[in-house]
A protein has these predicted regions:
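Membrane-embedded helix-loop-helix hairpins and adjacent transmembrane boundary segments
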Residues: 1-566
Length: 566
């Protein structure tokens, strides 16, 4: 890190935090804090994207592409369909009821226990995910500054809490517009830099050709196997379910589009996300592909996390084993480089050998990673998550390093602020306010802010354990998939099956959640199918249970919140 990098990083982060605090300095009521103000569609769309695009996205996805290629893009194939369905069928209901949280709808449709069960599932899943979102930039700052994870977690966490507590939903939205612009510019700049750094004559077409020979360009895998993690069908079906659950029932996203100036603005914001999100994720994956191709001409390291590798080498015999693997990697790289050069000169027969050598390199790196996991102290960052950061620090010019680090910090602030804002709002609205129905507006505002601070402490505490996970982007998605299916099932029963009442869906949700956890612990089913299984189980069990228990006393009518536009 040079002086210019520090200047870019510090100026960017301080400007965003200051902007959020200043723009929302007049927030004085609970309604303004929880609901926000009338946002236009581009603010809503960018805020939705920024909420999902955490620092984990920018750290892990290039590493995911480096290791496994473009297949991860299939995870997002169901997203555009989900946006259309939510914009036309779910959003109007939320706005008509003038809800602060999605879970208030469940009390109007079922009863309070169903509302609070679903809200509790959200609090658990999003509270843990917020910790993961904090850990990712802590990984960056630890690598650059050498600070302990606890200090870096605290630094980023406190910054996110500062402007979220200050301005609530509006502060999150106005800062995310800037953050998303910085993220997109940074990743586009990274891709163009790596593309320019390739040998003369390679270019975009040559990059795609080499990546294809390495087996990295399979963006669509039409497999029907349930144990294959990313396929066309798991993306379209499982991805649709997870997107419906995430954007339709996760308060961190629902809160983004409930703040629209009108139904039309909120609806257009969702459709904006449908158009832009998949290309953005493709760009981030292509950064990883570009790094792969770059390292067909310049030897890559055996291990990307040099800190963990250095610690593992202290164990008896490990240094010799890693040195032997490194020597074999040099031989594999030399042979593969020769094959790639032949391919670029028109020799198509080199492709099988290139692919075989790529698999050999992955095997060598896998052996080395296993050695490190067994011998390094616990709590190290995974090797895959270190790929992009290590490449940036080694190869990017001054200024661009600072911009890319700012991208990662901005993404962390954005995702963490959205999560804390939603966690605080859900705790206050769905749990505290029913206990204090006569609370004044000032008391409600104070409670929401205190809950936000409390969840910030929880997230920072959990972040200390995130480094035990193998790949952060997959950990976040698996965590969400465990809870999202049952949550979506409850909402779908509410919207589609009008005869089913609260007790039946409440018991069905508990049983389905237990089944999904058992599936996660005891099977090899790809995690995207957890969403489908959980949702279908809730619906099926609720139908059966309602037939058994029969009609029950209807829930009391839900009183819409004041101040919202229908």
């Amino acid at each position: 890190m040079r002086t210019l990098d520090w200047a870019v990083l510090i100026a960017t982060v301080l400007a965003i935090v200051s902007w959020g605090v200043w723009k929302t300095r007049r927030i004085r009521t609970a309604d303004a804090y929880l609901r926000g103000e009338g946002d236009r569609f581009w603010t809503i769309g960018l805020s939705i994207m920024a909420t999902q695009a955490s620092a984990i996205t920018f750290l892990s996805m290039p590493g995911q592409a480096y290791d496994d290629g473009l297949g991860f893009i299939q995870f997002y194939f169901g997203l555009p369909i989900a946006m259309v369905l939510l914009a036309w069928f779910v959003l109007p209901v939320y706005r008509r009821l003038r809800v602060y949280t999605a879970y208030e709808y469940l009390e109007s449709r079922f009863d309070r226990k169903t509302r609070q069960l679903t809200a509790a599932l959200f609090l658990v899943s999003r509270g843990l995910a917020a910790g993961l979102s904090l850990y990712a930039p802590a990984l960056v700052l630890t690598a650059v500054l050498g600070w302990p994870l606890q200090i870096t977690n605290l630094t980023v966490g406190v910054l996110a809490v500062l402007y979220t507590v200050s301005g609530g939903t509006r502060a999150v939205s106005v800062t995310q517009t800037l953050q998303m612009g910085i993220m997109l510019c940074g990743m586009l700049g990274a891709f163009l830099f790596v593309l320019h750094a390739l040998p003369a004559g390679v270019g975009l077409a040559g990059m795609a050709r080499v990546a294809g020979a390495l087996g990295k360009m399979h963006a669509v895998v039409p497999s029907l196997r349930f144990d294959t993690r990313y396929t066309l069908w798991s993306g379209l079906v499982g991805g649709l379910f997870v997107a419906l659950a995430y954007f339709g029932t996760d308060q961190s996203q629902v809160q983004r589009y409930l703040g629209g100036a009108s139904l039309r603005e909120s609806r257009t914001g969702l459709l904006f996300n449908a158009l832009i999100k998949v290309p953005m994720q493709f760009l981030i994956l292509m950064v990883g592909i570009a790094v792969v191709v770059f390292h067909q001409f310049e030897r890559p390291p055996l291990l990307w996390n040099s800190v963990a590798a250095g610690q593992a080498r202290q164990a008896p015999g490990v240094a010799a084993q890693l040195d032997a693997l490194d020597a074999r990697l040099s031989q594999t790289f030399a042979a593969k480089r020769a094959g790639v050069l032949s391919l670029l000169q028109g020799d198509e027969s080199a492709k099988p050998a290139i692919l075989a050598l790529e698999e050999q390199e992955k095997s060598l790196r896998g052996e080395a990673r296993a050695l490190v996991r067994r011998n390094a102290p616990p709590g190290q960052a995974s090797d895959a998550d270190s790929i992009f950061l290590t490449f940036v620090l080694r190869h990017f010019p001054p200024g661009l390093v600072g911009l890319l680090l700012a991208v990662i910090i901005c993404a962390a602030l954005s995702a963490t602020a959205s999560a804390l804002n939603a966690l605080g709002a859900t705790s206050a609205v769905d749990f505290w306010r029913p206990l204090r129905p006569q609370a004044t507006d000032e008391e409600q505002l104070r409670a929401a802010r205190l809950f936000t601070v409390g969840w910030g402490v929880v997230a920072m505490s959990f972040a200390a354990f995130a480094s035990l996970l193998d790949n952060l982007i997959q950990a976040v998605n698996i965590l969400g998939s465990i809870f999202y299916g049952p949550m979506l099932g409850v909402f779908l029963v509410g919207f589609l099956l009008k005869r089913i009442q609260g007790t039946a869906v409440f018991v069905a949700a508990l049983a389905a959640q237990a089944c999904v956890v058992a599936m996660w612990l005891a099977s090899d089913v790809g995690f995207l199918w957890y969403n489908v299984a959980g949702c279908v189980l809730v619906i099926a069990l609720a139908v059966v249970l309602q037939a058994v228990v029969g009609n029950a006393r209807p829930a009391q009518p839900f009183k819409a919140n004041p101040g919202g536009a229908p």
